């Protein structure tokens, strides 16, 4: 918990606006605010007043004092609502610094809220998720996490797990009771229930990560196969130049869209071929690098006569780059220009037939993309999650499986050890046991005013 210093920052986005908010938090927040306003501020009252630097008026606005612990950070907090001109706001910041405050670090207000038990770590991360949400569903899901829905699931699970651990360890510590707890049906049923709950949370977390972080799609293929046309069709607008000249796209073209509320980061790349053009060759190198970062690759081809096209075909197109491409990457083969066919083949497995230019098959392709990443559109029950949550849940799931094995083998002490490991992984999600390095990494990704 912070007790000795007071921080200040602009809490509203950069740029001009009707209102700009300065946030001050810490032990001297009230004293500093009263120096700036020359007013005595009452808790939870909106006070209209001038804001001064010494005796010079900087601006006027509304000032609200939130007395600890009834504030966002759990400390004394003052918010100054001034005119949203960056020069004015920076003058107020300088005046606050002159009165003894210091500039807040990124995410420091929310970090203080976490350290003062105003919210747990999962809720703190949801603050960033709700700010950065790029779709309505993502925003609603982040709000669920911020309200504590995700944390409640974890805490309810922890209660069951701790009760089971107490029972198991008590039985080990008091063998004179001559109770063979390993044959107790309560142990078996309780462990099975915990296993099923972790599995359900594991699946929900996967959905939550998709909403929070989106899906990165990369379009690759030979020149003039229709990658840029497909990008425009998916985006619903002309984001990339489309011509009949091979090699038109020479650099990475990015577009951010939504499919059924799921954020999609689509990347169009230079056509894959051997080229003497220095710029085009550099574009191809960048394309190969982006393939390694993708959640899913759309391999666009107009070779609609060959439904058995494989990613190894790249070896023939650009053999010098083939070894740099992950062989286990998730690929959908998009057969373009089916409007030239008399009879349209049926979609099968990872092969989808479309006409990007005529918008044929695009909806089926979108549906296929969502299915491939495992998104099930459970709007009402999804909360946002982070990759670290998924990692923790996956680890907890593996160890709860080991716990079941130890129970079947009759190894009581090893069962207790596995249950403890599961508890530690679950605790890391809400921040019960979190290293300083982890906290620093999480809160440094926030904007300054949060």
UniProtKB/Swiss-Prot annotation:
Mind telling me which GO cellular component terms the entry cites? cytosol
Against Pfam families, the record matches this protein to: MMR_HSR1, MnmE_helical, TrmE_N
Keyword Metal-binding recorded: yes
Q: Where in the cell is it found?
A: Cytoplasm
CDD domains in UniProt: trmE, TrmE_N
* Biological process per Gene Ontology, one example term: tRNA wobble uridine modification
Record-listed K(+) binding positions: 224, 243, 245, 248
Q: Which positions does UniProt annotate for (6S)-5-formyl-5,6,7,8-tetrahydrofolate binding?
A: 23, 79, 118, 450
Q: Does the keyword Nucleotide-binding apply?
A: yes
> What keywords would UniProt list here?
Cytoplasm, GTP-binding, Hydrolase, Magnesium, Metal-binding, Nucleotide-binding, Potassium, tRNA processing
Provide the top EC class: hydrolase
Report the cofactors: K(+)
- Tree of life domain: Bacteria
Binding locations of GTP: 224-229, 243-249, 268-271
| Chain sites annotated for binding Mg(2+) | 228, 249
Residue ranges of every copy of the TrmE-type G domain listed in the record: 214-374
**Gene Ontology MF, one:** metal ion binding
EC assignment: the record states 3.6.-.-
Q: Which InterPro entries match?
A: G_TrmE, GTP-bd, GTP-bd_TrmE_N, GTPase_MnmE, MnmE_dom2, MnmE_helical, P-loop_NTPase, Small_GTP-bd
User: Which NCBIfam families does the record match to this protein?
Assistant: mnmE_trmE_thdF, PRK05291.1-3, small_GTP
Q: What does this protein do?
A: Exhibits a very high intrinsic GTPase hydrolysis rate. Involved in the addition of a carboxymethylaminomethyl (cmnm) group at the wobble position (U34) of certain tRNAs, forming tRNA-cmnm(5)s(2)U34.
Family according to the record: Belongs to the TRAFAC class TrmE-Era-EngA-EngB-Septin-like GTPase superfamily. TrmE GTPase family.
Q: How does it assemble?
A: Homodimer. Heterotetramer of two MnmE and two MnmG subunits.
Q: What is the protein's given name?
A: tRNA modification GTPase MnmE
The species is Francisella tularensis subsp. holarctica (strain LVS)
> Which gene is annotated as encoding this protein in its UniProt record?
mnmE
């Amino acid at each position: 918990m912070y007790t000795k210093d007071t921080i200040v920052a602009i809490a509203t986005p950069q740029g001009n606006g009707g209102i700009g908010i300065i946030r001050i938090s810490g032990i001297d927040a009230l004293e500093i605010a009263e120096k700036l306003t020359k007013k005595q501020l009452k808790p939870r009252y909106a006070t209209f007043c001038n804001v001064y630097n010494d005796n010079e008026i900087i601006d006027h606005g509304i000032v609200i004092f939130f007395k600890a612990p009834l504030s966002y950070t759990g400390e004394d907090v003052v918010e100054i609502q001034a005119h949203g001109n960056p020069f004015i706001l920076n003058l107020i910041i300088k005046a606050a610094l002159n009165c003894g405050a210091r500039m807040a670090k990124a995410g420091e207000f929310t970090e203080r809220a976490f350290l003062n038990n105003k919210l747990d770590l999962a809720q703190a991360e949801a603050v960033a998720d709700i700010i950065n949400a790029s779709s309505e569903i993502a925003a609603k899901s982040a709000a669920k996490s911020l309200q504590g829905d995700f944390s409640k699931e974890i805490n309810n699970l922890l209660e069951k797990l701790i009760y089971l651990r107490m029972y198991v360890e008590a039985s080990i510590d008091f063998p004179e009771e001559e109770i063979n707890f390993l044959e107790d049906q309560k142990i078996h049923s309780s462990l099975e229930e915990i296993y099923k709950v972790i599995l359900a949370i594991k699946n929900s977390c996967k959905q939550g990560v998709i909403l929070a972080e989106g899906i990165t799609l990369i379009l690759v293929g030979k020149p003039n196969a229709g990658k840029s046309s497909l990008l425009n069709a998916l985006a619903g607008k002309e984001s990339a130049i489309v011509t009949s000249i091979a090699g038109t796209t020479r650099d990475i073209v990015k577009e951010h869209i939504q499919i059924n509320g799921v954020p999609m980061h689509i990347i169009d790349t230079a056509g894959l071929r051997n080229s003497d053009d220095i710029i085009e060759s550099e574009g191809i190198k960048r394309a190969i690098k982006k393939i390694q970062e993708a959640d899913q690759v759309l391999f666009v081809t107009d070779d609609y006569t060959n439904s058995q096209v494989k990613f190894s075909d790249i070896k023939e197109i650009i053999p010098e780059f083939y070894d740099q491409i992950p062989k286990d990457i998730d690929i959908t083969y998009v057969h373009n220009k089916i409007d030239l066919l008399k009879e349209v083949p049926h979609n099968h497995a990872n092969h989808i037939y479309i006409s990007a230019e005529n918008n044929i098959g695009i909806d089926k392709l979108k549906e296929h993309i969502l299915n491939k990443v495992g998104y099930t559109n459970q709007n009402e029950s999804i909360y946002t999650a982070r990759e670290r949550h998924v990692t923790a849940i996956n680890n907890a799931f593996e160890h709860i499986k080991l716990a079941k094995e130890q129970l079947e083998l009759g190894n009581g002490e090893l069962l207790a050890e596995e249950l403890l490991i599961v508890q530690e992984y679950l605790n890391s999600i809400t921040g019960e046991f979190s290293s300083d390095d982890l906290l620093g990494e999480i809160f440094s990704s926030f904007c300054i005013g949060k």
